[in-house]
């Protein structure tokens, strides 16, 4: 089980990213637009750099919904390999069958 603080920190980052996404996208569009004057693009770059670091989507860590584990998490299920194995052995994951050959 991951520390509660790590899980909460990641949830805070998700909320911040969701709230700041439109503003970040607008600033990035201004920066990428070469037809805009250099001063305006530079001002947008400064505004973007003043925004909180945690409002960037790259700061979000994929974590297991059950355990909070950060490594070996399947994106499709949002579960770690350990949680999938545990739930699968109990028959709680539809379509998951233990392999044997």
UniProtKB/Swiss-Prot annotation:
UniProt-listed GO biological process terms: translation
Molecular function terms, GO-annotated: rRNA binding; structural constituent of ribosome
Tell me which UniProt keywords the record has, alphabetically: Ribonucleoprotein, Ribosomal protein, RNA-binding, rRNA-binding
Decide whether keyword rRNA-binding is in the record.
Answer: yes
Domain of life from the UniProt record: Bacteria
Q: Does the keyword Transcription regulation apply?
A: no
Region: Disordered, residue numbers: 1-24
Q: Which GO terms describe its cellular component?
A: cytoplasm; small ribosomal subunit
Q: Where is the composition biased (Basic and acidic residues)?
A: 1-10
Residue ranges with Basic residues bias:
11-24
Oligomer and partners: Part of the 30S ribosomal subunit. Contacts proteins S3 and S10.
| Job description of the protein | Binds 16S rRNA, required for the assembly of 30S particles and may also be responsible for determining the conformation of the 16S rRNA at the A site.
HAMAP family xrefs: Ribosomal_uS14_1
Similarity field: Belongs to the universal ribosomal protein uS14 family.
Q: What is this protein called in UniProt?
A: Small ribosomal subunit protein uS14
Q: Which gene encodes it?
A: rpsN
């Amino acid at each position: 089980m991951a520390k509660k603080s790590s899980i909460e920190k990641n949830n805070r980052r998700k909320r911040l990213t969701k709230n700041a996404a439109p503003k970040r996208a607008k600033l990035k569009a201004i920066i990428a637009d070469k037809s805009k004057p250099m001063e305006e693009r530079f001002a947008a770059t400064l505004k973007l750099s003043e925004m909180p670091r945690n409002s960037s989507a790259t700061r979000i860590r994929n974590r297991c919904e059950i355990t909070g584990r950060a490594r070996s998490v399947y994106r499709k299920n949002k579960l770690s390999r350990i949680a999938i194995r545990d739930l699968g052995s109990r028959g709680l994951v539809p379509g998951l069958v233990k392999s044997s050959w």
